[in-house]
């Protein structure tokens, strides 16, 4: 790119600023300050000349200056837990300063302090009342929050905090503490708990952790060091010196404020350099003495500590800082082997952030994968590369909603690391540098993951060009989109991509001042903002936006067909659901859908053999119904859910084909035998009497009620069965097992599984009834008819009854609806509930109404679009009922279609009204505001709405164009081929 001197100067200046307060003993750190740690340091006392005094009064003064009018401490609060911990620790400091008169302290108005404490207590109560444990992401909060409440209650009996989340909080706390042993902290191996010793006051002997100090600090935590200094039996001058250095040289710069961690030498050095290098800055751009010093620090620590380092010298090693350092040194051409990283952090399915970690981190694994890909001999680490690639794809595929990580609250942070490392991975694959590392299926999954991780930020950009009005989040978004420009999947989206980058840069340029760049989105005990790191992301985004495109990647995974893509986009843009959307959004959803198609095609014969049917052209569009509906409202249901539903939709098309082209022919003259086959396959036992979450088997763990429908593994009296029977039974058994024994179904409640099994049975039986009802019409299919002559069904039921029962069941919507319900109930129900997707009677009734109106509507739309096809194939259509023949008059088929369209619109209005009432009932039952139950209920409703829109879209598109595969007309030829199968 053309040399941009101002940006280069800024980047070099940033590197120089990192060492502005560097100390050879303590290192450096620029993390923002936190009231939580400041409060703990303010509690340290020391006896001087026989009199106890507050050692750091400036810290307490800072707390007084920053208390809000509402009573809490709000600076830097980006999550509810921030306010709770900042306020709780500061309240403890206030109480101790008010009630400990014998300690020498600056003169304060005790009445003022008491008033401040009252306001702080009120604020804390309000914040605790709103706490939702299930959405709290900060590591260790379940230990630290109770540890803060205990001393407050001991300090003042009136400070007893009772709040809705206390019970679930204590349940998590007790479970974790039941595994804790003080001896763990007394050994030679450092543990992460050393960073939070204030949570173990009264539980450990502080004298026995003295050997874990690093230059006086307890794993770089001011609050943990303060707790140690307060509770060790002997005064520790090194720890006092450390705290004094932090107060003077950390981000507080002598104001009395301290951060949650100091120093962070390795963390900030490696993150800043890798961020700048990734964007395209070179070592020559950044050349200065400070760059040499940073590299010297990283290289020296990496060598001294044996190839695995922590966020500062001497601290517990973690894979993040180790991997980032390896990547930094590799870019600079330095030797940095990942062997020790692999030895220390590799687990069975992923890489741990640190030894003993329980919940794996996506970003840590992205960093580890990046370090391996930076090796000149990356293929040597093929097994580790494959392992991490599978893990990061699985992590993405299983994540519901926006991706989360435990080190940063912004979903774009894990996304940018994921996108960068997958682009590098695909690039090496296409250069032939990783032969045989990834199988074809994993490559398909990589392609989908990469595209979604790039597309969703493009969809989520705010109108003013930002992401969440955050300067750092906006930098992440820009970096993701600049990577997307290299991915060939986005070649047809270059215009919106470039415009989004331009608007993002314009927003970033409009922000100025230090405070505008302090985004408290990083996670420590409380959220923090690393100012220099934020600046590095902003500079990287600006540089990358101006850089020429790198080599294109992705062509080996998928090449978009230009003609077919545009044709489908134009078709679907006519649908009512999409008319208001920009065409590029539909094109993006179509590309995403096309990336699912190879995966579906790879498994298209897993269940049905697909004999004697036309080309399965529906595979080219089936995924689009799911991707488009998912993207339309930014629902972002998990990718695994999308794939499962695409596969179910494919099976539904195949089931229709199989029942018409195979089972319907083999059993044409004895349909009752086919009915009996289905009854044999899905035998009824008992009726559903009770709800309850299942544990694996077929019984409700609470009530003992058995399943009302059980599956048979083989046909009964097999010696008396014909080969035709066995063929059909085998295919339908494989189909029903795939659905009813799907992993997400196995963990659903008994009630939801019963309903699914019943609807599955009704679905299969409806195909038989449909075939019988169609028989008289199929005999007329080859008789020439004028277009204005209507075939009339001889069915004895009314159109109203037929379209709501047999007809609605036949299109698969009801059983698919209950498949979704099983998934939602299993995945998105509060722990301890019965696990039903719709727990209350009102929700169950209204959900059933939504389902039936949806199915009826879709069948009507289907019949509008497939009238000609049904006539050709002899299938019963809504328009064949006498009600429409009587209303045709002189207008013929068009009058009939208009009448059916009006009825379909009535059903659509009815489904929308039923869904609105279901949402109202759900809010009434589960609460309209915060809390785990209400949050999960809203999420279930969002995904149900997404499902309903997908069904609605099917109906709308059927009206525009019939997408089912045609069944061959020559039934004699079909029968001959089927007979050949048994010979």
Swiss-Prot record:
Q: Which residues bind Mg(2+) 1?
A: 656, 660
Q: Where is the composition biased (Polar residues)?
A: 688-698
GO BP field: diterpenoid biosynthetic process
> What does it catalyze?
(2E,6E,10E)-geranylgeranyl diphosphate = (+)-copalyl diphosphate
Q: What class of enzyme is it?
A: isomerase
Q: Which UniProt keywords apply?
A: Isomerase, Lyase, Magnesium, Metal-binding
- Could you say which residues bind Mg(2+) 2 here? 656, 660
Q: What is its EC number?
A: 5.5.1.12
Record-stated family: Belongs to the terpene synthase family.
Cofactor(s) recorded for this entry are: Mg(2+)
Question: What positions does the entry give for Mg(2+) 3 binding?
Answer: 862-863, 866, 870
Question: SUPFAM superfamilies of this UniProt entry?
Answer: Terpenoid cyclases/Protein prenyltransferases
Organism whose genome encodes this protein: Phomopsis amygdali
Q: What is the lineage of its organism?
A: Eukaryota, Fungi, Dikarya, Ascomycota, Pezizomycotina
Q: What is this protein called?
A: Copalyl diphosphate synthase
* Biological role: Involved in the synthesis of labdane-related hydrocarbons by catalyzing the conversion of geranylgeranyl diphosphate (GGDP) to (+)-copalyl diphosphate ((+)-CDP).
Q: Where is this region: Disordered?
A: 685-721
Q: Which gene encodes it?
A: PaDC2
Question: A single GO molecular function, which one?
Answer: magnesium ion binding
């Amino acid at each position: 790119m053309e040399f941009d001197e101002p940006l280069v100067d800024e980047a070099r200046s940033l590197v120089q600023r990192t060492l502005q307060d560097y100390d050879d003993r303590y290192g450096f750190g620029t993390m923002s300050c936190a009231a939580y740690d400041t409060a703990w340091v303010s509690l340290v006392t020391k006896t001087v000349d026989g009199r106890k005094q507050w050692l750091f009064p400036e810290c307490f003064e800072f707390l007084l200056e920053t208390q809000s009018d509402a009573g809490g401490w709000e600076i830097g609060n980006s999550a509810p837990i921030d306010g709770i911990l900042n306020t709780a620790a500061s309240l403890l400091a206030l109480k101790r300063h008010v009630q400990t008169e014998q300690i020498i302290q600056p003169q304060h108005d005790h009445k003022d302090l008491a008033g401040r404490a009252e306001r702080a207590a009120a604020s804390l109560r309000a914040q605790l009342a709103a706490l939702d444990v299930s959405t709290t992401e900060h590591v260790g909060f379940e230990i630290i929050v109770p540890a803060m409440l205990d001393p407050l209650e001991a300090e003042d009996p009136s400070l007893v905090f009772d709040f809705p989340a206390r019970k679930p909080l204590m349940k998590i706390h007790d479970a974790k503490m039941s595994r804790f042993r003080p001896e763990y902290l007394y050994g030679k191996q450092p543990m992460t708990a050393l960073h939070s010793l204030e949570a173990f006051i009264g539980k450990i002997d502080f004298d026995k952790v003295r050997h874990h100090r690093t230059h006086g600090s307890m794993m770089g935590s001011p609050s943990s060091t303060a707790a140690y200094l307060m509770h060790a039996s002997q005064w520790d001058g090194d720890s006092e010196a450390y705290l004094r250095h932090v107060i003077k040289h950390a981000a507080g710069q002598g104001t009395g404020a301290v951060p949650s961690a100091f120093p962070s030498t390795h963390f900030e050095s490696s993150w800043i350099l890798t961020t700048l290098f990734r964007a395209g800055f070179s070592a020559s751009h950044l050349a200065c003495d400070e760059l040499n010093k940073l590299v010297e620090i990283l290289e020296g620590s990496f060598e001294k500590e044996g190839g695995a380092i922590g966020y500062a010298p001497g601290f517990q090693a973690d894979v993040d800082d180790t991997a980032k350092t390896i990547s930094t040194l590799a870019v600079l051409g330095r030797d940095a082997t990942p062997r020790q990283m692999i030895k220390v952090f590799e687990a069975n399915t992923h890489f741990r952030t640190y030894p003993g970690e329980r919940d794996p981190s996506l970003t840590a694994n992205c960093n580890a994968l990046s370090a391996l890909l930076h090796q000149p001999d990356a293929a040597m680490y093929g097994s580790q590369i494959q392992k991490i690639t599978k893990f990061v794809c699985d992590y993405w595929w299983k994540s519901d909603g926006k991706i989360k990580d435990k080190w940063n609250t912004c979903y774009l942070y894990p996304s940018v690391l994921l996108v960068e490392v997958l682009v590098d991975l695909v690039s090496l694959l296409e250069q032939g540098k990783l032969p045989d590392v990834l199988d074809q299926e994993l490559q398909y999954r990589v392609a989908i993951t990469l595209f979604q991780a790039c597309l969703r930020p493009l969809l989520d950009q705010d109108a003013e060009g930002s992401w969440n009005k955050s300067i750092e989040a906006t930098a992440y978004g820009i970096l993701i989109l600049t990577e997307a420009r290299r991915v060939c999947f986005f070649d047809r989206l270059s215009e919106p991509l470039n415009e989004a980058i331009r608007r993002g840069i314009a927003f970033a340029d409009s922000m100025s001042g230090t405070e505008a760049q302090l985004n408290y989105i990083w996670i420590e005990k409380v959220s923090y903002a690393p100012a220099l790191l934020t600046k590095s992301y902003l500079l990287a985004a600006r540089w990358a936006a101006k850089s020429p495109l790198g080599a294109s990647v992705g062509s080996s995974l998928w090449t978009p067909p230009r003609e077919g893509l545009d044709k489908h986009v134009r078709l679907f843009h006519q649908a009512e659901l999409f008319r208001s959307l920009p065409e590029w959004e539909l094109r993006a959803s179509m590309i995403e859908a096309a990336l699912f198609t190879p995966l579906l095609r790879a498994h298209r014969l897993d269940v049905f053999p697909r004999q004697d049917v036309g080309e399965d052209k529906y595979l080219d569009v089936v995924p689009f119904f799911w991707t488009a509906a998912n993207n339309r409202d930014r629902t972002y249901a998990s990718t695994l859910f999308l794939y499962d539903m695409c596969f179910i939709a494919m099976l539904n098309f195949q089931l229709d084909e199989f029942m018409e082209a195979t089972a319907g022919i083999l059993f044409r003259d004895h349909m009752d035998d086919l009915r009996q086959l289905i009854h044999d396959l899905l035998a009824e036992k008992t009726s559903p009497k009770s709800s309850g979450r299942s544990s694996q088997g077929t019984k409700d763990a609470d009530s003992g009620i058995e399943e009302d429908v059980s599956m048979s593994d083989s046909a009964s009296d097999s010696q008396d069965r014909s080969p035709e029977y066995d063929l059909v039974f085998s295919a339908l058994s494989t189909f029903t097992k795939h659905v009813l024994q799907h992993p997400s179904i196995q963990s659903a409640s008994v009630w939801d599984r019963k309903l699914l099994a019943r609807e599955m049975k009704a679905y299969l039986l409806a195909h038989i009834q449909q075939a019988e009802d169609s028989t008289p019409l199929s005999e007329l299919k080859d008789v020439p008819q004028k277009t204005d002559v209507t075939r009339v069904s001889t069915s004895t039921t009314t159109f109203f009854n037929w379209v709501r029962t047999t007809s609605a069941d036949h299109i698969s919507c009801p059983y698919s609806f209950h498949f979704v319900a099983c998934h939602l109930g299993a995945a998105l129900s509060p722990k301890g509930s019965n696990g039903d997707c719709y727990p209350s009677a009102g929700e169950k009734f209204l959900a059933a109404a939504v389902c039936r109106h949806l199915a009826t509507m879709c069948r009507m739309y289907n019949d509008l679009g497939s009238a000609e096809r049904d006539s050709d194939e002899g299938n019963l259509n809504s328009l064949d009922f006498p009600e429409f023949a009587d209303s045709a008059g002189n207008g013929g088929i068009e009058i009939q279609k208009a009448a059916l369209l009006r009825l379909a619109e009535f059903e659509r209005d009815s489904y929308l009204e039923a869904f609105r009432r279901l949402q109202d009932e759900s809010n009434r039952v589960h609460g309209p505001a915060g809390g785990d139950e209400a949050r999960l209920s809203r999420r279930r409703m969002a995904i149900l709405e997404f499902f309903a829109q997908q069904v609605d879209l099917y109906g709308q598109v059927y009206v525009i164009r019939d997408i089912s595969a045609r069944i061959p007309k020559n039934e004699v030829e079909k029968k001959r081929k089927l007979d050949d199968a048994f010979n």
